[in-house]
């Protein structure tokens, strides 16, 4: 089986616990305005590799991954577009080395398409963009209906989840939207961590190299106090979501 990849990183430290082998898959159905890897969107380019070829690149660094409590993270692009390939890769990583596996996904995927992949995934890094449907379309080119269905499916499973959200001033920092995102997270018992990632402009040069106009030109990076306020709003939503779930579970059937 072959997959189409963009690149690899052998010493990743921000995409899951420990030191990790990070595999960037090629292809994405979203076109996020702040994307720092727009060169991963096109599904027709990249490098075709077999599972065995990827395993051979992991093996020399196994000791680092094991000692640090790390493993392998597959990101993109959107890795669920190549779910069968990633599932086979994770399956072999577990069979050969019992390696921790993490999937970094936007959730833009039909649940049944990712079922086999999730069965061999220890951790899902779920990148939630926005709760508001129209705002989501403007930001990513796609509605969030499919993402919300996938998120609900994840909540029913045993996979550990880290939720990540990119905070963009004036775009993804609406108090109402952050609160509603928190409410959703609060209903998900398997969410272990929530990270608000401050928007940055480090990928702008890639848009320029591709001859694309950067959609967020002029948008500034958030201040620390703005990130703190956003975190507080999300946490308030999480508290409300947990309380609502608790009351719903404890309510007698009519």
For each predicted feature, which ranges?
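Canonical Radical SAM [4Fe-4S] cluster-binding loop centered on the CxxxCxxC motif
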Residues: 7-9, 13-49
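Short, conserved loop/turn and helix-capping segments at secondary-structure boundaries
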Residues: 48, 141-144, 221-224
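A short acidic, helix-capping loop that chelates divalent metal ions and anchors anionic groups
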Residues: 41-44, 132-138, 206, 217
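Conserved AdoMet/S-adenosylmethionine-binding subsite of the radical SAM
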Residues: 59-63, 68-71, 76-202
């Amino acid at each position: 089986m072959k997959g189409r990849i963009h690149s690899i990183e052998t010493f990743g430290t921000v995409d899951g616990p420990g030191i990790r082998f990070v595999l960037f898959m090629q292809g994405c159905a979203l076109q996020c305005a702040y994307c720092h890897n727009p060169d991963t969107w096109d599904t027709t380019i990249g490098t075709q590799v077999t599972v065995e070829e990827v395993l051979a690149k992991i093996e020399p660094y196994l000791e680092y991954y094991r000692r640090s409590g790390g493993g392998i993270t597959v990101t993109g692009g959107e890795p669920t577009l190549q779910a069968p390939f990633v599932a086979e890769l994770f399956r072999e990583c577990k069979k050969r080395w019992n390696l921790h596996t993490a999937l970094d996904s936007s959730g833009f995927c039909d649940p049944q398409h990712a079922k086999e992949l999730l069965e061999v995934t220890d951790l899902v890094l779920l990148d939630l963009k926005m709760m508001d449907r129209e705002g989501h379309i403007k930001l990513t080119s796609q509605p969030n209906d499919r993402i919300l269905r996938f998120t609900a499916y994840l909540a029913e499973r045993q996979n550990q989840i880290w939720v990540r959200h990119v905070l963009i001033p004036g775009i993804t920092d609406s108090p109402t939207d952050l609160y509603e995102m928190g409410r959703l997270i609060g209903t998900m018992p398997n969410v272990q961590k929530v990270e608000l990632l401050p928007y940055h402009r480090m990928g702008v040069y890639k848009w320029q190299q591709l001859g694309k106009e950067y959609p967020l030109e002029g948008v500034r990076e958030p201040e620390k106090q703005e990130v703190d306020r956003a975190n507080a709003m999300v946490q308030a939503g999480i508290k409300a979501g947990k309380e609502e779930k608790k009351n719903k579970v404890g309510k007698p059937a009519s």
